[in-house]
């Protein structure tokens, strides 16, 4: 029929076993179903193509004019009201990260001792910039922290509030591009005693005008430690995580995929670092970084 010619072809039949549901409480699920039901009545007869209808590509495009912007927020000094100590050694981290990301082709900007409002403002403005000619975006947060929180010089703010500016529905020029966040901060007060292990052997996309992707897609969060634990920093050398990250990026930043890079960072922090403190409660402790990836493709900085 003529009316069907402009409709995108439906490539996959609906599952006859039933409709998709949500993992929510019964009261929330019924509300969501009601909302979705209303939307269905008003929906166009033309099906919207989803990402699974496209020919898959497994590498992020990096052939843009620029690699992208890298913002480093380096919080060293804190207002007395926060009760937080000076983060000695963080300037070493900021300097090493500046050189490292610049060598990868990023336009790097460092901001020191930012308030919570300043951090929000910086990242909001960055998300409003035109990233059309950039391959990706990176941000490094160096500060004190708690689980899901990061300290500005004057208090704490949720990490989610900082990163949400770059969601797909808010920052359109970074849509389907990697948004990388590296976070050097404590995530709790637990200590990792480690466990003795036996030594062993060392072991271009086609245009498609109508499809949707999740707004939280294409994010990567690389945390210096796992939820609930301290993150260690040496006053003379910088934090363990940043030392390892910069070392691996210098060695393999242009030839390994990002998850391979971060896996090697995990290994280096786990094997090569151990705390040395006069206080026996804090002596001989270990640390393991943690990454949370919503990336949808492989990322190579050197391609």
From Swiss-Prot:
Control of this protein's activity: During activation, the N-terminal disordered prodomain is removed by cleavage. Concomitantly, double cleavage gives rise to a large Caspase-7 subunit p20 and a small Caspase-7 subunit p11. The two large and two small subunits then assemble to form the active CASP7 complex. Can be cleaved and activated by different caspases, depending on the context. Cleaved and activated by initiator caspases (CASP8 and/or CASP9), leading to execution phase of apoptosis. Cleavage and maturation by GZMB regulates granzyme-mediated programmed cell death. Cleavage and maturation by CASP1 regulates pyroptosis.
Binding partners and assembly: Heterotetramer that consists of two anti-parallel arranged heterodimers, each one formed by a 20 kDa (p20) and a 11 kDa (p11) subunit. Interacts with XIAP (via its second BIR domain); inhibiting CASP7 activity. Interacts with BIRC6/bruce. Interacts with ATXN3 (short isoform 1). Interacts with HSPA5.
Biased composition (Basic and acidic residues): 10-27
Gene3D superfamilies noted in UniProt: 3.40.50.1460
Protein's name according to its UniProt entry: Caspase-7
Region (Exosite): 38-41
Taxonomic lineage from the root: Eukaryota, Metazoa, Chordata, Craniata, Vertebrata
GO annotations of cellular component type: cytoplasm; cytosol; extracellular space; nucleus
Superkingdom of origin organism: Eukaryota
Enzyme Commission number(s) of this protein: 3.4.22.60
UniProt subcellular location: Cytoplasm, Cytosol; Nucleus; Secreted, Extracellular space
Listed GO MF terms: aspartic-type endopeptidase activity; cysteine-type endopeptidase activity; RNA binding
């Amino acid at each position: 029929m003529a009316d069907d010619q402009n409709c995108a072809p439906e490539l996959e039949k609906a599952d006859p076993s039933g409709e998709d549901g949500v993992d929510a409480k019964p009261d929330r699920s019924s509300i969501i179903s009601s909302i979705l039901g209303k939307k269905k009545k008003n929906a166009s007869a033309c099906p919207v193509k989803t990402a699974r209808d496209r020919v898959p590509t497994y590498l992020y495009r990096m052939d843009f004019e620029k690699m992208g912007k890298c913002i480093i927020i380096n919080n060293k000094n804190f207002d007395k009201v926060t009760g937080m100590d000076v983060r000695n050694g963080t300037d070493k981290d900021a300097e090493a990260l500046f050189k490292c990301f610049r060598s990868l082709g990023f336009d790097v900007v460092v901001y020191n001792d930012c308030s919570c409002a300043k951090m929000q403002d910086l990242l909001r403005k960055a998300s409003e910039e035109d990233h059309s000619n950039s391959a990706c975006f990176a941000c490094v947060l160096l500060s004190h922290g708690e689980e899901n929180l990061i300290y500005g010089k004057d208090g704490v703010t949720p990490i989610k509030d900082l990163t949400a500016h770059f969601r797909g529905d808010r920052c359109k020029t970074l849509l389907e591009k990697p948004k990388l966040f590296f976070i050097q901060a404590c995530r709790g007060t637990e200590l990792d005693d480690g466990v003795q292990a036996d030594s062993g052997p060392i072991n271009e996309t086609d245009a498609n005008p109508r499809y949707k992707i999740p707004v939280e897609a294409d994010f990567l969060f690389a945390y210096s430690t796992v939820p609930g634990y301290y993150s260690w920093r040496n006053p003379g050398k910088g934090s363990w995580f940043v030392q390892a990250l910069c070392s691996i990026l210098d060695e393999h930043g242009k030839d390994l995929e990002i998850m391979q890079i971060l896996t090697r960072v995990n290994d280096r922090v786990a094997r090569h670092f151990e705390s040395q403190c006069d206080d026996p409660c804090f002596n001989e402790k270990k640390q393991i970084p943690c990454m949370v990836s919503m990336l949808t493709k492989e990322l190579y900085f050197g391609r």
